[in-house]
């Protein structure tokens, strides 16, 4: 009887060990990387390519790090809600708290919206800290002070532990504004009317353009926030059409994400002031997406200019060109510029894990991984060779400018401030 019981118990132990082995993917522990991006709403056109690129990079690593001793899994979380049709503060806060509580998560790739990052950075900062790598945030105050653009308590307010845990592969709006302003000058623009969606990102980039436009001799007629839930903007556009001494400005700049009715703003601008050769329509990375063209219509969107962090495809090195070829082979071709940002965000996470192991550390140690992220220097990524500085900012202040031509954004070139 005792012998039979012993045999049954032994088999149970062996079975449990086999299950554990399967769960760990053939040896070693399992680590988890998550992304938190708006996967509901118009931004999906941009964010799906980032998620695809993140998965592509992990697949290229075979889902393993540290010589195969650790399995790495990836989950794409949505920080948007159907109710808002865009990123939702409540959902992003929930995501950050969920990640903080799950000790298997060693990197949080996000966010897409700067306002979302302002909520999640402090939560993750007190959870290890847990490394956060954004493929897209451009508001400077998340990492550094910028005169006239950031609040007095930024960025320290986001790091209650006193240790930095947030880095990003996107250049910031204190660079994006000057790039846009200098480009406007090159187009012969002398007067501009600036609109913003009143969010951290949209107002922030609009403020930067305002500041840079004045510095470059452009007259800013006004800057105002618009109601993102309005049915139309014909009254607003009618007002703007006579704001320049009875006539229209040379250009309208719209600091907004696509989810905040940017396509409707464009439609009503064209309806009241004519096509984009008459009064130029310019915006930032938040509208640099096929969703703008789909929402406004091909004819209406023709001629729109937009800036976005990164390099024109023709200016990418071999690693960047290989990324787009690999992406196309797996998911189909894309012109969304944030795809490569997603790839290098995952690149940075994998690099940090490998570096922790190479130093004899434990890649499940959040503090060690965070330290390794900030130690990334002269990394050969898809964007080129880059580093993270002490603030967590990427050392590539490059922006590409695109113009809508025949229903698609076409690279107009790479620009620096």
Regions found by a protein language model. Give the residues of each.
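Short, low-complexity disordered leader/linker segments with a strong preference
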Residues: 1-32, 66, 100, 416-417
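Immediate post-signal peptide segment of exported/extracytoplasmic ligand-binding proteins
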Residues: 24-35, 65-71, 185-190
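Beta-alpha junction/loop-to-helix N-cap segments that form part of ligand/metal-binding clefts
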Residues: 26-28, 45-49, 64-154, 169, ...
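Extracytoplasmic "Venus flytrap"
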Residues: 34-57, 61, 65, 77-89, ...
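Periplasmic-binding protein-like
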Residues: 35, 99-112, 130-135, 193-196, ...
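Extracytoplasmic ligand/sensor domains, especially the bilobed periplasmic-binding protein
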Residues: 106-224, 280-302
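Segments of small-molecule ligand-sensing domains
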Residues: 327-339, 350-411
